[in-house]
């Protein structure tokens, strides 16, 4: 359930920051989509990049919704499990903790990038997978940080339902066979 209330004038500096965040998120999505094309569909790295794109798209939608609310001078009130969402009392501490975790995740990814550059070809796939995994973690932390700093509940909801199993179910009492 979403309630709309009329509010006063929007802060121009907040609007500029929000526009910069939206532009940055669009760039991240574009970069990730280009990166996605370099890996075959169904590979672990391809799927990790696709997950990162989905997280970025949700973050972008959240930021665009906040920007539209500012432009129309509307206050959005969110409910979680039937209860109006309110920012936690320790919001500043949570934001600081998220910023620390984000810095650590970025440092870890950078470390893996450096190690990969000096590694033998035989171990590069391991570093690529590790880097892709850490980049998903970074996207998740960025989403949480954007949610906290823009007044959204920091929950991630998948964009689409999970794919159904490609393996057919065997009738009761019969073994499953591959076709």
Spans of features found by a protein language model:
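Charged, low-complexity interaction regions
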Residues: 36-49, 75, 111-128, 149-151, ...
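Post-signal peptide N-terminal segment of mature Sec-exported envelope proteins
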Residues: 14-42, 47
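Compositionally biased, proline/threonine/alanine/serine-rich low-complexity intrinsically disordered stretches
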Residues: 96, 149-179
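Amphipathic alpha-helical coiled-coil segments
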Residues: 32-36, 54-77, 103-110, 134-152
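C-terminal motif of bacterial Sec signal peptides marking the signal peptidase cleavage site
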Residues: 5-8
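Extended alpha-helical coiled-coil "stalk/arm" regions
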Residues: 40-94
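Bacterial signal peptide processing site
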Residues: 10-12
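Short, charged, amphipathic alpha-helical segments
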Residues: 19-20, 45-58, 122-142
């Amino acid at each position: 359930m979403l309630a709309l209330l009329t509010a006063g004038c929007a802060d121009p500096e907040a609007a500029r920051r929000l526009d910069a965040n939206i532009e940055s998120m669009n760039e991240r999505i574009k970069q990730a989509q280009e990166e996605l094309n370099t890996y075959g569909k169904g590979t672990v790295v391809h799927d990790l990049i696709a997950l990162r794109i989905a997280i970025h798209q949700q973050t972008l939608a959240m930021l665009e919704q906040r920007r539209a609310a500012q432009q129309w001078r509307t206050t959005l009130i969110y409910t979680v499990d039937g209860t109006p969402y309110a920012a936690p009392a320790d919001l500043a501490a949570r934001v600081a903790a998220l910023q620390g975790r984000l810095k650590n995740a970025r440092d870890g990814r950078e470390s893996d990038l450096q190690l990969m550059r000096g590694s033998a070809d035989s171990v590069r796939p391991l570093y690529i997978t590790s880097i892709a995994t850490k980049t998903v973690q970074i996207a998740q932390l960025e989403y949480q940080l954007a949610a906290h700093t823009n007044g959204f509940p920091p929950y991630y909801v998948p964009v689409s339902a999970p794919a159904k199993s490609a393996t057919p179910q065997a009738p009761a009492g019969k073994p499953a066979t591959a076709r």
